[in-house]
């Protein structure tokens, strides 16, 4: 049980230490500089609202991004984002220690590359070092962030968090956003959303591991895969997984992105197509890399793509774009 007390969490000292974390990489941002121009007044005003429980989350500004795929991002005001960081900082370690090992999204010492390596490890074990057929059930949850049910999330949180005032605070953040349906959806862009969706999906992870007793399962956000040498077994657990997602979490699978394939014929997972002896970057990603590296790309763009391309069979693409290993 998370036992930290609300009054300690919202202390001025804690707000100040959280602000220092929040500032990293943001000092030159206009909205941050405006907040900092009256820093003491803003911090004390926020603290007063939190103490009196009169705090109301502000509005969001929305914009679209298209890399790696089209997404609608919602950005909160600085004071609200500071509070997101505070909540995240307090809750992260409590929940992270309870998550399953093979949940890889938005966690320290996890990430895409660890998930890719784990997928390869699982495939090697199931296929007995590529000497028998390995089947992969690959699934994608439909409209993941925009389908998170607020009431269900609160029920899950109440099983872990004792302090009712902490529930109130988290509730202010959760209820600050909804899709076309009131009480549904978390915004892409909130730091808290990254943690809350992992808490939400931990219910599914535990169902898969403890109830279904699936051995070779891994998940990255809304993408997950199960590996087995028995296709019929995968077909059977898919039905049970869909039912749990629908009835317990009010989520559904993306019908166009659910399939069972053999490892030998190539499995598309986390941007790469996986084969027994190599993995190839997805064709759409390849075109995007070439397009984004034309002209004079930013150094951070070059560095990001160089890191990406080191994790698969990309010699021709690296030669074409000039991204040879350092």
Locate the predicted segments by residue.
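Short, conserved non-catalytic motifs in the polymerase core
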Residues: 25-33, 58-84, 98-111, 176-198
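Right-hand nucleic-acid polymerase module
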Residues: 76, 85, 232-236, 251-326
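A residue-level signal for conserved active-site and pocket-lining positions in enzyme catalytic cores
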Residues: 30, 87, 119, 170, ...
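Beta-rich nucleic-acid/ligand-interaction surfaces
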Residues: 106-115, 225-226, 260-264
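Active-site-proximal segment of RNA-dependent polymerases
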Residues: 2-5, 90-146
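Conserved polymerase palm-domain catalytic core
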Residues: 42, 49-50, 120-221, 225-241, ...
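Reverse-transcriptase-like RNA-dependent polymerase core
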Residues: 11-15, 46-69, 82, 89, ...
């Amino acid at each position: 049980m998370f036992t930290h007390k609300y009054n300690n969490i919202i202390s001025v000292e804690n707000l100040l230490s959280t602000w220092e974390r929040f500032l990293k990489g943001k000092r030159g941002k206009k909205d941050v500089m405006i907040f900092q121009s009256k820093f003491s007044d803003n911090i004390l005003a926020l603290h007063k609202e939190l103490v009196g429980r009169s705090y109301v989350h502000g509005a969001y500004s929305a914009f679209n991004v298209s890399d790696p795929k089209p997404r609608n991002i919602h950005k909160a005001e600085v004071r609200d984002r500071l509070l997101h960081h505070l909540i995240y900082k307090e809750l992260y370690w409590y929940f992270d220690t309870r998550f399953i090992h093979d949940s890889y999204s938005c966690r320290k010492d996890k990430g895409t590359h660890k998930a890719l390596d784990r997928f390869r490890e699982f495939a090697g074990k199931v296929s007995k070092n590529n000497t028998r057929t390995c089947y992969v059930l690959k699934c994608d949850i439909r409209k993941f962030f925009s389908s998170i049910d607020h009431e269900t999330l609160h029920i899950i949180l109440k099983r872990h968090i004792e302090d009712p005032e902490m529930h109130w605070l988290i509730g202010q953040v959760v209820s600050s956003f909804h899709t076309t349906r009131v009480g549904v959806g978390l915004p892409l862009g909130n730091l808290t959303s990254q943690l809350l969706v992992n808490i939400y999906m931990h219910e599914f992870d535990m169902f898969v591991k403890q109830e279904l007793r699936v051995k070779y399962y891994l998940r990255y956000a809304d993408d997950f895969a199960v590996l087995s040498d028995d296709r019929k077994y995968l077909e059977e657990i898919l039905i049970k997984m869909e039912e749990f997602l629908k009835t317990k979490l009010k989520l559904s699978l993306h019908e166009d992105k659910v399939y069972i394939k053999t490892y030998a014929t190539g499995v598309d997972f986390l941007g790469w197509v996986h084969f027994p002896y190599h993995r190839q970057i997805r064709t759409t990603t390849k075109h995007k890399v070439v397009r984004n590296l034309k002209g004079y790309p930013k150094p951070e763009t070059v560095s990001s793509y160089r890191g990406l391309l080191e994790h698969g069979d990309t010699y021709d693409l690296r030669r074409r774009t000039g991204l040879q290993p350092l």
